[in-house]
Swiss-Prot record:
Coiled coil: none annotated. It is a multi-pass membrane protein. Belongs to the AAE transporter (TC 2.A.81) family. YbjL subfamily. Its main location: membrane. Keywords: Cell membrane, Membrane, Repeat, Transmembrane, Transmembrane helix, Transport. GO terms for molecular function: monoatomic cation transmembrane transporter activity. This is Putative transport protein AHA_2450. It comes from Aeromonas hydrophila subsp. hydrophila (strain ATCC 7966 / DSM 30187 / BCRC 13018 / CCUG 14551 / JCM 1027 / KCTC 2358 / NCIMB 9240 / NCTC 8049). InterPro entries: AAE_transporter, RCK_C, RCK_C_sf, Transp_YbjL_put, YidE_YbjL. The lineage of its organism: Bacteria, Pseudomonadati, Pseudomonadota, Gammaproteobacteria, Aeromonadales. HAMAP family: YbjL (MF_01015).
Length: 561
């Protein structure tokens, strides 16, 4: 039996889809030094190659792909989209607007100057900014009929131009941004590490390398005369045992009676105390503690130490500084703070926002009490709330279908913006109500990445058939335009941030990469600064940038026509 694999690919959209995905994702694993091609570039380039070989994708799967992707982008942005307007929020929003508007008008100007075909500007904008949401917004604005095409303008040719412009400039945008943020501090004669340390001193920050990646442990000691004399009748609060030892007193046994002490308790000679702390804290205990005998008492040591992820929700703590929680007095250890999927540097003055995730270790009941005070413990479940997911998805489609009429002008949001807004609402509600709209991080990442990959396959296959002709005709112009749109808005944003907003350069470069929603570039800034502090700036702009970039895709189509 003979199997014609090429014929099978031509006859089966499903087989073609997953063959391109498999080869593209494999290509995305290729590394050149510290640079990895990545899934988006790998799938897009593979799809372009298959498209050039004559393969076509006629299924409607593309629509499902881009809708899943943009909806998941909204869910990710939702918890912090509104809270970004708090501390430094106006700076981050203004910076994002400056970068985006500069890129938008520059792209339109270049497209008009070089007389590029309809749709090419949208592709150049999305590719140069490495923003798939911008491409999704542009294509959806065209497909949904929000804009009336000029006479004799073929929609498919406009869509193909978008895909080709995006494909030609995406790699330029990614590598270009990484190079700019890497060498801009040197050109500006700045030591990024010094600037990062300056912020660290001002805000009491520490880097991730100093954090504990393991649980605290429990050990028990009998209070000897030396320790009792040092305490001298002072309460636990007055003694400050945690600052002195790095451990806190979880239990006391006195005259055979077990008790959980509060800050007003006084330790006496002969007491047996259970101390909770990291192993090195026990090793470095003052000699006063070691003069007493270590105790191995099952009841005294029978404590359950847990690590939980607590989602910040309660208005009483939102907007307050982390240090105000007095975690150590509550017998809790902070392992990390995550915001917008980015692990933040330790900043005792960081202002808490709804949706922040605090990873806390400590005795189970203490951690539970803390969670009740500041929010809720993230659900330990691998089950997606599909009822909420599908309901908000439908809501997004309904929002996108609404049109407003102003005289002869009809305006609608389209599916992309509608789904993005519905996703933001679902993510925001999830940050405030633990039982609504839960999607496990792995499931959300799968839906987002798979939706993006399917969209890239469709875009690449459709654009691939004419990419060689476009390369010979306008390839150099498109690549040159992509270089300008990649670099100039970043330079304008940097100068605006330094001269007008007076931002610290380390935070500013992190914010610029967030405004471009480019995590690989943020890693470059972190490496140059030898610090994770730029992540503070990245998290400040990332959520709002995703929304603005989607809208920009729709707007640039409007500018062109």
């Amino acid at each position: 039996m003979t199997i014609d694999f090429v014929t099978l690919l031509h006859q089966s959209d499903s087989l073609l889809l997953f063959v391109v995905l498999a080869f593209g994702l494999l290509l995305g694993k290729v590394r050149f030094g510290n640079f990895q091609i990545g899934n988006t570039i790998g799938v897009l380039f593979t799809a372009l190659l298959f498209g050039q070989m004559g393969f076509e994708f006629t299924a409607t799967t593309e629509n499902v792909g881009f809708m899943l992707f943009i909806f998941c982008v909204g869910i990710e942005a939702g918890p912090h989209f509104f809270s970004v307007f708090l501390r430094d929020g106006i700076h981050y929003i203004t910076l994002t607007l400056v970068i985006l508007l500069t890129a938008l008008f520059l792209t339109v100007g270049l497209a008009k100057f070089f007389n590029l075909g309809p749709g090419m500007a949208a592709g150049i904008l999305a590719g140069s900014l490495t923003s798939t949401p911008a491409l999704v917004g542009a294509q959806d604005a065209l497909r949904s009929g929000l804009l009336n095409l000029p006479h004799q303008t073929d929609m498919q040719s406009v869509l193909d131009n978008m895909g080709i412009g995006y494909a030609l400039t995406y790699l330029v945008g990614l590598v270009g941004l990484m190079l700019v943020v890497r060498y801009l501090p040197s050109l500006a004669r700045l030591d990024l590490n010094t600037e990062a340390q300056k912020i660290a001193r001002e805000r009491g920050l520490s880097d991730n390398e100093s954090r504990k990646t393991y649980l605290p442990i429990i050990r028990a000691y009998r209070v000897g005369p030396e320790l009792a004399a040092w305490i001298g009748g002072r309460t636990l609060r007055e003694t400050g045992i945690y600052p002195h030892t790095g451990c806190y007193v979880e239990r006391i046994r006195r005259n055979g009676i077990l008790a959980s002490p509060d800050g007003d308790a006084v330790i006496q000679e002969g007491d047996e105390i259970a101390l909770v702390g990291y192993p090195e804290s026990h090793e470095k205990l003052d000699v006063n503690y070691r003069n007493g005998k270590e105790v191995f008492d099952r009841n005294l040591l029978d404590l359950q130490i847990v690590t939980e992820e607590i989602v910040v929700k309660n208005d009483a703590v939102v907007g307050r500084h982390l240090v105000e929680l007095n975690l150590t007095e509550k017998g809790c250890f902070l392992n990390r703070v995550v915001r917008s999927q980015i692990e933040m540097p330790f900043d005792r003055n960081i202002m808490l926002q709804k949706g922040d995730v605090l990873q806390i270790s400590g005795e189970k009941q203490r951690v539970k009490l803390l969670a009740n005070k500041i929010g809720f413990i993230s659900i330990h479940s691998q089950t997606t709330d599909l009822v909420a997911f599908t309901t908000f998805f439908v809501l997004g489609l309904l929002i996108g279908s609404v049109s407003l009429v102003f005289g002869q002008l009809e305006f609608g949001l389209g599916n992309a913006v509608g789904l993005l807004l519905a996703g933001i609402l679902m993510g925001y509600l999830r940050a405030n109500h633990p039982t609504v709209g839960y999607v496990p991080p792995g499931a959300l990442r799968l839906a987002k990445d798979l939706g993006l990959a399917v969209f890239m396959v469709s875009t690449g296959l459709k654009a691939g058939g004419g990419i060689l002709d476009h390369l010979s005709q306008v390839g150099a112009v498109v690549l040159f335009s992509g270089m300008l749109v990649t670099t100039l808005p970043v330079l304008v944003g940097y100068l605006f941030g330094v001269w007008v907003l007076k931002m610290n350069p380390a935070l500013l470069l992190g914010a610029i990469t967030g405004a471009r929603t480019c995590a690989p570039a943020m890693d470059v800034v972190n490496e140059a600064a030898n610090s994770s502090i730029p992540a503070l700036g990245y998290a400040g702009t990332y959520a709002v940038a995703n929304v603005m970039l989607t809208l920009a895709g729709s707007f640039i189509i409007g500018f062109w026509f």
